[in-house]
Amino acid sequence: MTWNKAPAADAEAGGGGDTGHARLRELGYKQELKRDLSVLSNFAFSFSIISVLTGITTLYNTGLSFGGPATMTFGWFVAGAFTMTVGLSMAEICSSFPTSGGLYYWSARLSGKRWAPFASWITGWFNIVGQWAVTTSVDFSLAQLIQVIILLSTGGNNGGGYMASKYVVIAFHAAILLSHAAINSLPITWLSFFGQFAAAWNMLGVFVLMIAVPTVATERASAKFVFTHFNTENNAGIHSNFYIFVLGLLMSQYTLTGYDASAHMTEETKNADRNGPIGIISAIGISIIVGWGYILGITFAVKDIPYLLNPENDAGGYAIAEVFYLAFKSRYGSGIGGIICLGIVAVAIYFCGMSSVTSNSRMAYAFSRDGAMPLSSVWHKVNKHEVPINAVWLSALISLCMALPSLGSLVAFQAMVSIATIGLYVAYALPILFRVTLARKHFVPGPFNLGRCGVAVGWAAVLWVATITVLFSLPVSYPVTKDTLNYTPVAVGGLFLLVLSSWLLSARHWFKGPITNLDG
């Protein structure tokens, strides 16, 4: 892993000596967005989207069901280590091509002239749909958490508490998205402030919860339980320990997504060819550390796994909510402290969704700038504050529409949000695959590069994505029925067929890949 010094001529070429601005001109693009983000702000957007409080909290049930403490404790590092290989490879490419288009632009440049249009088309659509799915799942998760907070605040499941209907939950989701679109319509200086505040909230929130919850709990699990207990009682008909461990990894892998935000924010980041890669790598690394601490802290307050997963408990089967609630109720006779803890998580999830919309809109802006989206001329326009305002509201609207299937079936909704993990990682892997194959000999690294390790790290990243794509498509319950079928391969396969057919029937005749907009 090395850092190359940028040529002086490049560093001085426009943009007040900013190397990212100079590199953007070399790539053929005008500076249309306000370049005002520091390396800290760039990191903050990715760290806030990864948001360990969001991913671990919302999928803690999955971790408990499939393997329990042992899977979560050690599986977190398995997923984290391989995620870092993906992040390192992406950071190396980002350093060479610091544009808002990110992944799809990289695929075009790395696959060669013959394959560039098709490669960027496939990568771009998997990336943007995956991002929309992330925003959908994050904000819907917040709506569901609000539902649980209201339930516990009004007496709990066993005390006559109010359980909001699915229509109320979707209304919460719509209101959250509306507020996120409004915030993302503000100038980038405001978003920079919110992003840094969100990162600080996530960091402090983890430390508060990992210390407070097990400290308050009157009964705590032993270290042996936290590090070695392997739960096989999943009520899913699955008995293979390896299979159970694999399914338990979903919590970790779902959490460790969204760090492509640092790449999509590069046209607004100072010296992006250096600071973009730093944002990606540091967001993953710090998330791995604080996420493990959060898992340990909460799991030390776990005693009775079947009860936590039981829909008849006070939190309606929402495991972490029940852990928080019981910890305070057992000591103080009231669970209000646990509800406040859930409020800390809710704020973190809110900021996660906010940053997701920011990343979505920059991707939509870049993709439409290259003519890949319907009504492209509308979506890549920027307002007087140099914000892609139309792309912001488009992203919010699509994320709302993607949540509507939840009104008919949560199974259908889960199929759609599965794209958030697998679909997005496919988009991550494609430019890395082109980097280690078609572009292996002619790739020109930027200031950050992996040196001789680049190809090996890249292959490790590609193989990991291929592995999780297969593993997370396996059945999660036996016997398999229409209600228990894992619809991930259906959703991801359906997206691939839709993108491929649109290419064959139409786009191949007019889409030529990324186009420059620099006059002269």
Swiss-Prot record:
It comes from the Eukaryota. The chain crosses the membrane at residues 39-59, 74-94, 118-138, 168-188, 193-213, 236-256, 278-298, 334-354, 387-407, 410-430, 454-474, 487-507. It is found in: Membrane. GO terms for molecular function: gamma-aminobutyric acid transmembrane transporter activity; L-alanine transmembrane transporter activity; L-glutamate transmembrane transporter activity; L-lysine transmembrane transporter activity. Keywords: Amino-acid transport, Membrane, Transmembrane, Transmembrane helix, Transport. GO terms for biological process: gamma-aminobutyric acid transport. InterPro entries: AA/rel_permease1, AA_permease. May be involved in the transport of amino acids. NCBIfam families: 2A0304 (TIGR00907). Belongs to the amino acid-polyamine-organocation (APC) superfamily. Amino acid/choline transporter (ACT) (TC 2.A.3.4) family. This is Amino-acid permease BAT1 homolog.
